[in-house]
Protein backbone atom coordinates (compact mmCIF):
# COMPACT_ATOMS: atom_id res chain seq x y z
CA UNK A 1 0.00 0.00 0.00
CA UNK A 2 1.36 3.39 -0.99
CA UNK A 3 1.26 6.29 1.46
CA UNK A 4 1.63 9.96 0.56
CA UNK A 5 1.33 13.12 2.61
CA UNK A 6 -0.18 16.41 1.57
CA UNK A 7 2.62 18.87 2.22
CA UNK A 8 4.02 21.65 0.04
CA UNK A 9 4.62 18.92 -2.50
CA UNK A 10 2.79 15.65 -2.79
CA UNK A 11 5.32 13.42 -1.02
CA UNK A 12 5.35 9.64 -1.15
CA UNK A 13 6.73 7.88 1.93
CA UNK A 14 6.63 4.43 0.36
CA UNK A 15 8.50 3.07 -2.64
CA UNK A 16 5.88 2.86 -5.35
CA UNK A 17 6.98 2.55 -8.95
CA UNK A 18 3.79 2.86 -11.01
CA UNK A 19 2.57 6.34 -11.93
CA UNK A 20 0.16 7.57 -9.27
CA UNK A 21 -3.16 9.34 -9.77
CA UNK A 22 -4.46 11.30 -6.79
CA UNK A 23 -8.22 11.55 -6.32
CA UNK A 24 -10.78 12.41 -3.66
CA UNK A 25 -14.26 11.19 -2.88
CA UNK A 26 -16.78 11.88 -0.11
CA UNK A 27 -17.12 8.20 0.87
CA UNK A 28 -15.72 4.73 0.16
CA UNK A 29 -18.54 3.73 -2.18
CA UNK A 30 -17.98 6.76 -4.40
CA UNK A 31 -14.22 6.23 -4.23
CA UNK A 32 -14.58 2.66 -5.47
CA UNK A 33 -16.69 3.84 -8.42
CA UNK A 34 -14.22 6.60 -9.29
CA UNK A 35 -11.24 4.26 -9.03
CA UNK A 36 -12.52 2.11 -11.89
CA UNK A 37 -11.95 4.97 -14.33
CA UNK A 38 -8.39 5.77 -13.29
CA UNK A 39 -5.25 4.58 -15.04
CA UNK A 40 -2.23 3.97 -12.84
CA UNK A 41 -2.05 3.61 -9.09
CA UNK A 42 -5.16 5.19 -7.53
CA UNK A 43 -4.25 7.26 -4.46
CA UNK A 44 -7.24 8.36 -2.35
CA UNK A 45 -7.22 11.54 -0.25
CA UNK A 46 -8.14 10.93 3.40
CA UNK A 47 -8.44 13.87 5.78
CA UNK A 48 -7.47 12.72 9.27
CA UNK A 49 -7.34 13.61 12.93
CA UNK A 50 -5.63 11.03 15.13
CA UNK A 51 -5.68 11.15 18.91
CA UNK A 52 -5.26 8.58 21.67
CA UNK A 53 -8.83 9.48 22.68
CA UNK A 54 -11.40 8.60 19.99
CA UNK A 55 -13.92 11.19 21.20
CA UNK A 56 -11.34 13.97 21.20
CA UNK A 57 -10.38 13.09 17.62
CA UNK A 58 -14.03 13.12 16.55
CA UNK A 59 -14.56 16.54 18.15
CA UNK A 60 -11.47 17.96 16.45
CA UNK A 61 -12.59 16.57 13.10
CA UNK A 62 -16.05 18.04 13.54
CA UNK A 63 -14.59 21.44 14.46
CA UNK A 64 -12.24 21.36 11.46
CA UNK A 65 -15.13 21.57 9.01
CA UNK A 66 -13.83 18.96 6.58
CA UNK A 67 -15.09 19.43 3.03
CA UNK A 68 -16.13 16.67 0.67
CA UNK A 69 -13.12 14.38 1.09
CA UNK A 70 -13.25 11.07 2.91
CA UNK A 71 -12.38 11.78 6.53
CA UNK A 72 -11.38 9.85 9.62
CA UNK A 73 -11.22 10.90 13.25
CA UNK A 74 -10.04 8.35 15.79
CA UNK A 75 -7.08 6.35 17.01
CA UNK A 76 -3.95 5.32 15.13
CA UNK A 77 -5.02 1.66 15.20
CA UNK A 78 -8.41 2.61 13.79
CA UNK A 79 -6.78 4.56 10.97
CA UNK A 80 -4.53 1.60 10.18
CA UNK A 81 -7.61 -0.62 9.99
CA UNK A 82 -9.35 1.78 7.62
CA UNK A 83 -6.32 2.00 5.33
CA UNK A 84 -5.95 -1.79 5.18
CA UNK A 85 -9.66 -2.10 4.35
CA UNK A 86 -9.31 0.51 1.58
CA UNK A 87 -6.42 -1.44 0.07
CA UNK A 88 -7.78 -4.97 0.44
CA UNK A 89 -11.22 -4.01 -0.89
CA UNK A 90 -9.62 -2.52 -4.00
CA UNK A 91 -10.91 0.97 -3.27
CA UNK A 92 -7.43 2.44 -3.82
CA UNK A 93 -3.80 1.43 -4.16
CA UNK A 94 -2.79 3.95 -1.54
CA UNK A 95 -3.76 7.10 0.30
CA UNK A 96 -2.75 10.69 0.74
CA UNK A 97 -3.02 11.64 4.42
CA UNK A 98 -4.22 15.20 4.90
CA UNK A 99 -4.17 16.55 8.46
CA UNK A 100 -7.46 18.21 9.37
CA UNK A 101 -5.83 20.24 12.14
CA UNK A 102 -2.55 22.19 11.92
CA UNK A 103 -1.00 20.60 15.03
CA UNK A 104 -1.10 17.12 13.41
CA UNK A 105 2.33 16.22 11.97
CA UNK A 106 1.54 14.53 8.65
CA UNK A 107 4.94 12.88 8.23
CA UNK A 108 5.06 11.45 11.78
CA UNK A 109 1.48 10.25 11.46
CA UNK A 110 2.13 8.62 8.08
CA UNK A 111 5.26 6.87 9.34
CA UNK A 112 3.48 5.55 12.43
CA UNK A 113 0.43 4.31 10.56
CA UNK A 114 2.51 2.82 7.72
CA UNK A 115 4.24 0.46 10.17
CA UNK A 116 0.88 -0.74 11.50
CA UNK A 117 -0.56 -1.12 8.02
CA UNK A 118 2.44 -3.19 6.91
CA UNK A 119 2.07 -5.44 9.94
CA UNK A 120 -1.66 -5.97 9.28
CA UNK A 121 -1.09 -6.69 5.61
CA UNK A 122 1.53 -9.33 6.49
CA UNK A 123 -0.98 -10.92 8.88
CA UNK A 124 -3.73 -10.84 6.23
CA UNK A 125 -1.56 -12.56 3.60
Residue spans of the language-model regions?
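C-terminal amphipathic alpha-helical "assembly" element
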Residues: 1-125
Amino acid sequence: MRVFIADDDWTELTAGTAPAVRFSAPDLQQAQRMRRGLAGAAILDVTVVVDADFRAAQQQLSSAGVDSTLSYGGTLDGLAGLLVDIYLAGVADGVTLIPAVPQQDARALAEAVSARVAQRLRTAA
